[in-house]
Amino acid sequence: MAASKPVEAAVVAAAVPSSGSGVGGGGTAGPGTGGLPRWQLALAVGAPLLLGAGAIYLWSRQQRRREARGRGDASGLKRNSERKTPEGRASPAPGSGHPEGPGAHLDMNSLDRAQAAKNKGNKYFKAGKYEQAIQCYTEAISLCPTEKNVDLSTFYQNRAAAFEQLQKWKEVAQDCTKAVELNPKYVKALFRRAKAHEKLDNKKECLEDVTAVCILEGFQNQQSMLLADKVLKLLGKEKAKEKYKNREPLMPSPQFIKSYFSSFTDDIISQPMLKGEKSDEDKDKEGEALEVKENSGYLKAKQYMEEENYDKIISECSKEIDAEGKYMAEALLLRATFYLLIGNANAAKPDLDKVISLKEANVKLRANALIKRGSMYMQQQQPLLSTQDFNMAADIDPQNADVYHHRGQLKILLDQVEEAVADFDECIRLRPESALAQAQKCFALYRQAYTGNNSSQIQAAMKGFEEVIKKFPRCAEGYALYAQALTDQQQFGKADEMYDKCIDLEPDNATTYVHKGLLQLQWKQDLDRGLELISKAIEIDNKCDFAYETMGTIEVQRGNMEKAIDMFNKAINLAKSEMEMAHLYSLCDAAHAQTEVAKKYGLKPPTL
């Protein structure tokens, strides 16, 4: 399969296909589009433009260049990450100096008394006497002239800090709100309120506050970035859990399904029907399957597969299973596979469990079920169960090349590159004609060399890619993986040629167009051409969530938040796993939060 995902994470190609966020829940940064945080090898699935902590906020690159221009002390903006201590005397905002005139002396005395009370409170605070500190800050608030907004905001923020030490989160939020009302860009108060909202489980409010903090700080403070990432993940998981259980199953595109099955060579259920299994009668005008010589739901399902009439497969398999027919084990495995393809892992697991437990079933059926269940476990972030299933598959069917091929992908995801290469070697020994395994072995070696910064090994891996595409000129995946390695090496022109080869071989593979579009942005900063190619991907396959997600990400960077949110929502509706959906909700929520913060604080998003 060509240009599936940014080749970073991996194992889903074997089981729960996901053209969105991929498999793992983290991992190390590696080569690919812009140092993405996860590796996805992906034979049959397209991966997303993944974003790490804080990077979801796509203003960071531009904001960092501004080096705190236009930020006065009144904002409370500081570069250190420690925020627990109260503040000393606040500097007035520009234009808010002490008034001159008849009442100036009285105001100064009132302000001085307020400052003295605050200073006394600070001493109590540092001594751990928070109740006494609160009394002093309350006195400062009552003494302070009402027109002294900046000073008043500091007193409220200091009192909030004392309430925070007593874990009185409601009072913390209330005092921080007062401080922000008086000084809208008061970073320290905004962040303290964000933490209080987190404790009160007010995730939406927490996200808006911490988003404002990240923007005002220019994405320079790790503490606020981590909180932003944390709350986005929590919101994403919460929303995905509710949405996913009520989602309508959706069959992926024919290209996606064919690519998925192409990653298996020892899979009985995906092999063409034998001559004895069907008659020579033509199919009727209604598109019904060719008559099979046996009254078998499974054989009808197989015929529908050959006709790419995928929507009827699950029901025909169910007929075979209900009748306890001759092909019951095959029907269970085929039904489970299509449950996985439509993103219904809960329905797939019982079928896979049953096939695995059928000792009398063909060993290749049981091994294939173990591969798919193991890959499903990996997508659910259960690596121990996943590893157990792959090892069991190798034990019961040691001559099955698929076991080593897909276990190799698992090992890459687990950062066990040497073991991955050994598995790919075993797959190649068993199936010398396996172009996919040879291409993925090259990529595993390349990744190892890249992360180890070993230039000679990088060159050896690049030479290996050349040999693979020369030996297997019809393997689109070889060109796709090579293109991603070339992109890492800044060889953009040659990478573009490799993507063109992929498109020639698989013109209906939408993900290749997305990768080629991203390359135009990285290589030539050609936004129009990049968007044209991603739009072409959607035209080819309107179920390609990778394309919608990437389009949404670019629209955020262009400042088109409404369109970005629309793209993310389309991707959410196409997500094939709860984890993928949670990731997409995080992107969508980040865009929503930036929109609200921009309105509230008058911040105009920078554009590409």
UniProtKB/Swiss-Prot annotation:
The protein, known as: Mitochondrial import receptor subunit TOM70
Location of N-acetylalanine modifications: 2
Cited function: Acts as a receptor of the preprotein translocase complex of the outer mitochondrial membrane (TOM complex). Recognizes and mediates the translocation of mitochondrial preproteins from the cytosol into the mitochondria in a chaperone dependent manner. Mediates TBK1 and IRF3 activation induced by MAVS in response to Sendai virus infection and promotes host antiviral responses during virus infection. Upon Sendai virus infection, recruits HSP90AA1:IRF3:BAX in mitochondrion and the complex induces apoptosis.
Mutagenesis / variant outcome for changing residue 195 to A: No effect on interaction with HSP90AA1
SS bonds (residue pairs): none
Residues that bear Phosphoserine: 91, 96, 110, 434
UniProt keywords, alphabetically: Acetylation, Host-virus interaction, Isopeptide bond, Membrane, Methylation, Mitochondrion, Mitochondrion outer membrane, Phosphoprotein, Repeat, TPR repeat, Transmembrane, Transmembrane helix, Ubl conjugation
GO molecular-function term, one example from the UniProt record: mitochondrion targeting sequence binding
Cross-link (Glycyl lysine isopeptide (Lys-Gly) (interchain with G-Cter in SUMO2)): 275
Modification N6-acetyllysine, positions: 185
TPR repeat extents: 114-147, 153-186, 294-327, 329-362, 367-400, 401-434, 440-475, 476-509, 511-544, 545-578
Entry's localization field: Mitochondrion outer membrane
Annotated gene: TOMM70
Organism: Homo sapiens
